Regions:
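N-terminal beta1-alpha1 cap of cysteine-dependent amidohydrolase-like domains
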Residues: 1-191
């Protein structure tokens, strides 16, 4: 439908990337190519994968890089070296050790601390560890429940945030981790 809309205003796509939950068979790809007036090798699947980091390798394996270069009239040389990227994926997938990290913050939205989560994940991969991240809402941290809330965490990250809301819980978490020798990284309040 989106391709039809593009074509109705005079735009003809050169490459289609299809989001899909599972691998599509050749017949479906040929049908899409035919109905959308694109070459079959320019219909690329972006199927659900265990990790977003596998997408570049999957796209290259389907020839997306070659298709784009060809459509742009650029010379097609050697494939980009994805060796370091594949090594990263291999380390990520084969990590056997696990570390539990608690994120103490006040924002419930999963994406609020996305860069922190990804940084921890990358650091874990670099150190051959899987990182289990538990969100701990600082608004509900008290002296009475802090031990239970931080139980089982190998380390704590105290996340940034604006305004007064949740600050008391962050201070309680910082005090508890300092007095109980739990490694802590504070990204706010001058920590």
């Amino acid at each position: 439908h989106s391709v039809k809309e593009l074509q109705s205003v005079g735009i003809q796509p050169d490459v289609l990337i299809l989001r899909t939950e599972k691998h599509l068979d050749e017949g479906i790809l040929k049908k899409v190519a035919s109905f959308c007036n694109v070459d079959i090798d320019c219909v690329i699947q972006s199927e659900d994968l265990p990790s977003i980091y596998e997408v570049p390798v999957n796209m290259q394996n389907q020839g997306l890089d070659t298709a784009i270069l060809r459509k742009m009239g650029e010379p097609i040389g050697e494939k980009p070296a994805l060796g370091p990227w594949k090594t990263f994926l291999d380390r990520r997938n084969k990590a056997t050790e696990t570390v539990n990290i608690g994120l103490v913050g006040k924002y419930d939205l999963q994406d609020a601390y996305k860069s922190i989560r990804e940084s921890l994940s990358h650091a874990g991969t670099y150190n051959d560890h899987k990182v289990n991240i538990t969100f701990i809402n600082s608004e509900y941290l008290t002296e009475e429940n802090v031990a239970e809330q931080l139980k089982g965490q190998d380390g704590i990250v105290i996340c940034p945030g604006f305004g007064q809301r949740g600050i008391e819980g962050k201070i309680i978490a910082a005090h508890y981790t300092r007095t109980h020798d739990i490694p802590t990284f504070g990204i706010c309040l001058g920590m």
